[in-house]
Amino acid sequence: MRNGRCLVTPFVTAQRLANLRNTLWNRQQIAFSTTTASSSTSPIQESSSPLSIRFEYGLPLLDVPLPSRNEPCQFTMRPLSDTIGSLCEFLRQEDRGIDYVAVYGTNGVKLATCTSIEHLLQFGSFRLRLNDKFFDVTVPKTGTMPYDSDKLRQLDDLRATVASLHAALCVDEYKLSREKKLLLQLENAETLLAPLHDAKRKIEQECEAHTDRVMWAGFAAMGVQTGLFARLTWWEYSWDIMEPVTYFATYSTVCATFGYYLYTQQSFEYPSARERVYTKQFYRRAQKQNFDIEKYNRLVTEVDELRNQLKRMRDPLFQHLPVSYLSNLEAEK
């Protein structure tokens, strides 16, 4: 019996050691699972301070406390064009001390950077993470509806419908008022242009007469020269004496025409020479009679433009065009 008792005692001791080992192992597993659970749920933390979005001038504004300077900074968000990624980029640019910035939903799920601000505002609330700090952001109920893209599209369609109705109802009235205005401007311009036309016509008549006299004087000089050479050749002297004289006279004429080219940069032709004499005489007489050539040219251009606009306004192809298109055509002219 003593030997049997000695054999049972080591067996009981070994069983107790095994139970103690299992207990320690279970405690380590529970501690590890608790640590893992706490680390896996670390992104969902208590927020440092709540933030709220407000709306000013139709745009949402968010005041975010920057971690580096510990001061609030206002950020303007554009619902239709900005995204969460652009908001995060704006935060990084404003504070270089921000290493990590993200936006989470209320359930702890991170939102993609491609999510639009319009969609984010429709959530009503979300969480903003700056480094290790979390901020609960709330959106007022009145701020989520005006930035619905569907409502904006409906508003654009309504605006286009109103514009088309306005164009259809007011295009005739616009054309009549525009035509009346153009006729009044044309009448005023023609009234100012009429006395200048009379003065110009009088100066032109005087210049035409002067140019004709100059041309006939040149023809008479050539005739006198021809008669003088004929008299000297057949009556006074012989051809042997007059041949060198006529040669030098002809060569002198060539030199004179070349000098005319150097002075006017034009070849010597009778029509161009006559036009030059006429133009010089016209400007000389206009200055003498106080005729404003620049004013006359400006009025002539204005009258031509007004007549072209009236012609375009009365064109059958432009009868059913909208007012905005007609205004653009007139602005181009």
Swiss-Prot record:
<keyword id="KW-0107">Calcium channel</keyword>
<feature type="transit peptide" description="Mitochondrion">
    <location>
        <begin position="1"/>
        <end position="22"/>
    </location>
</feature>
<dbReference type="GO" id="GO:1990246">
    <property type="term" value="C:uniplex complex"/>
</dbReference>
<comment type="function">
    <text>Mitochondrial inner membrane calcium uniporter that mediates calcium uptake into mitochondria. Constitutes a pore-forming and calcium-conducting subunit. Mitochondrial calcium homeostasis plays key roles in cellular physiology and regulates cell bioenergetics, cytoplasmic calcium signals and activation of cell death pathways. Required for rapid mitochondrial calcium uptake and mitochondrial reactive oxygen species (mtROS) production after wounding.</text>
</comment>
<dbReference type="GO" id="GO:0005262">
    <property type="term" value="F:calcium channel activity"/>
</dbReference>
<dbReference type="Pfam" id="PF04678">
    <property type="entry name" value="MCU"/>
</dbReference>
<feature type="short sequence motif" description="Selectivity filter">
    <location>
        <begin position="239"/>
        <end position="247"/>
    </location>
</feature>
<keyword id="KW-0999">Mitochondrion inner membrane</keyword>
<keyword id="KW-1133">Transmembrane helix</keyword>
<dbReference type="GO" id="GO:0046872">
    <property type="term" value="F:metal ion binding"/>
</dbReference>
<keyword id="KW-0406">Ion transport</keyword>
<dbReference type="GO" id="GO:0015292">
    <property type="term" value="F:uniporter activity"/>
</dbReference>
<dbReference type="GO" id="GO:0051560">
    <property type="term" value="P:mitochondrial calcium ion homeostasis"/>
</dbReference>
<keyword id="KW-0175">Coiled coil</keyword>
<protein>
    <recommendedName>
        <fullName>Calcium uniporter protein, mitochondrial</fullName>
    </recommendedName>
</protein>
<feature type="transmembrane region" description="Helical">
    <location>
        <begin position="215"/>
        <end position="234"/>
    </location>
</feature>
<keyword id="KW-0479">Metal-binding</keyword>
<keyword id="KW-0496">Mitochondrion</keyword>
<keyword id="KW-0813">Transport</keyword>
<dbReference type="GO" id="GO:0061041">
    <property type="term" value="P:regulation of wound healing"/>
</dbReference>
<dbReference type="GO" id="GO:1903426">
    <property type="term" value="P:regulation of reactive oxygen species biosynthetic process"/>
</dbReference>
<dbReference type="GO" id="GO:0042802">
    <property type="term" value="F:identical protein binding"/>
</dbReference>
<dbReference type="GO" id="GO:0051260">
    <property type="term" value="P:protein homooligomerization"/>
</dbReference>
<keyword id="KW-0106">Calcium</keyword>
<feature type="topological domain" description="Mitochondrial intermembrane">
    <location>
        <begin position="235"/>
        <end position="243"/>
    </location>
</feature>
<feature type="coiled-coil region">
    <location>
        <begin position="289"/>
        <end position="316"/>
    </location>
</feature>
<dbReference type="InterPro" id="IPR039055">
    <property type="entry name" value="MCU_fam"/>
</dbReference>
<dbReference type="InterPro" id="IPR006769">
    <property type="entry name" value="MCU_C"/>
</dbReference>
<feature type="topological domain" description="Mitochondrial matrix">
    <location>
        <begin position="23"/>
        <end position="214"/>
    </location>
</feature>
<feature type="transmembrane region" description="Helical">
    <location>
        <begin position="244"/>
        <end position="260"/>
    </location>
</feature>
<dbReference type="GO" id="GO:0006851">
    <property type="term" value="P:mitochondrial calcium ion transmembrane transport"/>
</dbReference>
<feature type="region of interest" description="Inner juxtamembrane helix (IJMH)">
    <location>
        <begin position="262"/>
        <end position="271"/>
    </location>
</feature>
<keyword id="KW-0809">Transit peptide</keyword>
<feature type="coiled-coil region">
    <location>
        <begin position="180"/>
        <end position="193"/>
    </location>
</feature>
<keyword id="KW-0407">Ion channel</keyword>
<feature type="region of interest" description="Outer juxtamembrane helix (OJMH)">
    <location>
        <begin position="195"/>
        <end position="213"/>
    </location>
</feature>
<comment type="similarity">
    <text>Belongs to the MCU (TC 1.A.77) family.</text>
</comment>
<keyword id="KW-0109">Calcium transport</keyword>
<dbReference type="GO" id="GO:0036444">
    <property type="term" value="P:calcium import into the mitochondrion"/>
</dbReference>
<keyword id="KW-0812">Transmembrane</keyword>
<feature type="binding site">
    <location>
        <position position="243"/>
    </location>
    <ligand>
        <name>Ca(2+)</name>
    </ligand>
</feature>
<feature type="topological domain" description="Mitochondrial matrix">
    <location>
        <begin position="261"/>
        <end position="333"/>
    </location>
</feature>
